[in-house]
Amino acid sequence: MSRDFNKNKVAVLTGAAKKIGRSTAIRLAEQGFNILIHTGGKSIEEAKYTIKLLEKFKIKSNYVTGDLANLETINIIKDAALKLGTPSVLVNNAGLRIHEHFEKIDYKDWKKVMTVNVDASFLCAQALITYMVKQKWGRVINIGGLSAHIGAKERAHVVTSKAALVGLTKAISMEFIERGVTCNCVVPGFIEDFDSKETKLSGHWLRHPQTPSLVQNRFGNPDEVAEVIANLCKKEADYINGQTLHVNGGSYTP
């Protein structure tokens, strides 16, 4: 049923060459969506590998590269998506996380974080939502950040940008629900980064002062976040709209 409904529908995922983006692309391909993934210039090989992983699902797929701080990238994403079918799902997964003391944050860094985390999410949604409205069905999913809800040191620009995504989610959800498009925000907790030694599960990170209490005594993994995103993209999820869904094992319970 899902694969038939999703035929010729395109899921666009930004910042999706690996980790949560890759896991989500695989699950959406399983549901029959054609897949377009966007990546920055540093992850091209990972993007190619992700596309290779999608081959077994017999769907159309492609990737594009570009810096979301350069807003021309939005047009590149839209044009590439249209070549695969009708843009129907947008997962705004790309994001910058720059650490700096509040009083030392350079305004250029502030603007870059806002451009990538907020402006690009807005502009991608604006560019693609027209096609969702025309078919009276679509999904916009913003990937938020736990820091927007609990705060964080040395990340004022990141915290502010992720909080803005919650507001953007609510605005889109109210404006487009009568036209068949829902918008939700998924907020991962501490997720294992298999590419980085720094975030390997260890006593150090479990005791880190900026790590919330991990009630399950472990980090999450990208597949667990991707499962939530993929379920929101099902036809059966029409009644879930304007929500902020936390995936953190119970470490933060609003």
Report residues per predicted region.
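Residue(s) in the substrate-gating loop at a strand-loop-helix junction
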Residues: 145
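A glycine/serine/threonine-rich, flexible loop-to-helix segment
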Residues: 99, 178, 185, 189-214, ...
